[in-house]
Amino acid sequence: FINYRDAYGSLIVKKHLAGNDINPDDEFTFCINLNDDSINTTFGGVEFIRGTATVDIKGNESLTINGIPHGTNYTVTERDYRGEGYETTSINETGTISENNPAIVEFTNTRNTYGDLIVHKRLAGNAANRDQRFLFTVTLSDTTISDKFGDMIFENGVAKFELSGGESKKAVSLPNGITYKVVEDDYSSLGYVTTKTHDTGTITGNEEIEAIFTNTRDTYGSLEVSKVLTGNDVDTNK
């Protein structure tokens, strides 16, 4: 008597996303090659033609393929997403299917993008002091940021600096997705009226945001007009 037993194993492909600029709804295309072009069948709902199958997997999801014959060699490759800003690392992308332990393949795509923030100081009005220094505070939602970014030095997500009229400071390479708030000290006691644009918002990768603060100060005087008559024959009633 000769007894035969077929053995099968599983292949699990996991897709991970990392970085500050990712979309969990994005799908990523994979090619699974079983290194045997005689395989024309379906394993675990995945159809293989001449030993090759193409599948799409969303970020942070996985695909399990059961019923692959024990001892089958495999190679998993992901489409090249460098053009979309992703850097890809992989683990166990090649190997052999085993009956006892599933083959686990992991791909991690990382994408980080960065944006810039510029704070402008402008003056207007007939009594603005061009030598006046104005104090600003920039607060980021990420309190772990403590470093120099362009013209701004942050400590625990906060940067302070002074600007005169016509000057600006630029923070470069701030992480995509963090929020910011720019506050100028109150100078109303000096007669300034302040208007501002984009003083709060969210940093967007590969974009530049301009926060503009305009302080206006006008002063006004009075004009008195008097009429003086001279001579020995004037009419004071005129």
Model regions and ranges:
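Solvent-exposed loop/turn and edge beta-strand elements of beta-rich ligand-binding domains
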Residues: F1-K238
